[in-house]
Amino acid sequence: MFEARLGQATILKKILDAIKDLLNEATFDCSDSGIQLQAMDNSHVSLVSLTLRSDGFDKFRCDRNLSMGMNLGSMAKILKCANNEDNVTMKAQDNADTVTIMFESANQEKVSDYEMKLMNLDQEHLGIPETDFSCVVRMPAMEFARICRDLAQFSESVVICCTKEGVKFSASGDVGTANIKLAQTGSVDKEEEAVIIEMQEPVTLTFACRYLNAFTKATPLSTQVQLSMCADVPLVVEYAIKDLGHIRYYLAPKIEDNET
């Protein structure tokens, strides 16, 4: 028997919004430690990795390991039926071919449940190697989303350059060239507004704008985003999900700067 309950459906809605544009379907691997999802995006360019810890749920029970293949579009339709403040519970029997998603209003006067068919998905687990990154940047998630959106108007690619002076985002195309520089912040009143750069050595890498913009769909989950970079290694874009886990996106750099 598997059962997981969250106090607010809005969290699950935001998680799904963060991945459904990249993935049509995915397997949720459930164990007593929580829920994991790992999948290549539809075009096999980026990797999505989601971790939700069991202790972050209001209630969590998983008697035996369970893999639930789900159509994320179908799941999004079901979640649209929930109010943001509703409790949401996911339940499945061992070896079941369906999952039940139940919404309960805060005053418990309304309970709705939806049954969704599970899918058999052949998904290989890719080993993600531990990497000592040359540069790790923590910055406001809204700021990163805005930079990615703005630079996408100039080019299909964005160059991220990290030095001890700061981090620079650049794009160049027919319209012209755009450069946005962020220096490390001094003291800030609010931690979520800080820009923090940990650099071992400078790094300059080029990435596809459309994937970065897809990753920023996770912005509502977190006030800060962490970018981890190293030459010839995929960029890691990480959003923490408060008290519950994190979502990470991996994107390989473009080999040549002039490649579109």
Swiss-Prot record:
Tissue-level expression reads: Expressed at high levels in adult ovary.
Any GO MF annotation of the entry: DNA binding
Tell me which Gene3D superfamilies the record gives. Answer: 3.70.10.10
Record's InterPro entries? DNA_clamp_sf, Pr_cel_nuc_antig, Pr_cel_nuc_antig_C, Pr_cel_nuc_antig_CS, Pr_cel_nuc_antig_N
Q: Which residues bind DNA?
A: 61-80
**Keyword terms, alphabetized:** Chromosome, Cytoplasm, DNA replication, DNA-binding, Nucleus
User: What happens without the gene?
Assistant: Mutant flies show temperature-sensitive lethality, hypersensitivity to DNA-damaging agents such as ionizing radiation and methyl methanesulfonate, suppression of position-effect variegation and female sterility.
Q: Name one Pfam family in it.
A: PCNA_C
GO cellular component terms, alphabetically, are: chromatin; cytoplasm; nuclear replication fork; nucleus; PCNA complex
Q: Which GO terms describe its biological process?
A: DNA damage response; DNA replication; DNA-templated DNA replication; eggshell chorion gene amplification; leading strand elongation; mismatch repair; mitotic spindle organization; nucleotide-excision repair
Q: Where is this chain primarily localised?
A: nucleus
Q: Does the keyword Nucleus apply?
A: yes
Q: Where does the record say this protein resides?
A: Nucleus; Chromosome; Cytoplasm
Q: Which family does it belong to?
A: Belongs to the PCNA family.
Q: What does this protein do?
A: Likely to be an auxiliary protein of DNA polymerase delta complex and is probably involved in the control of DNA replication and repair by increasing the polymerase's processibility.
Assembly description: Homotrimer. Forms a complex with activator 1 heteropentamer in the presence of ATP. Interacts with E2f. Interacts with the catalytic subunits of two DNA polymerase complexes: PolD1 from the delta complex and PolE1/DNApol-epsilon255 from the epsilon complex.
Name of the featured protein: Proliferating cell nuclear antigen
Lineage of source species: Eukaryota, Metazoa, Ecdysozoa, Arthropoda, Hexapoda
Instruction: State the gene name recorded for this protein.
Output: PCNA
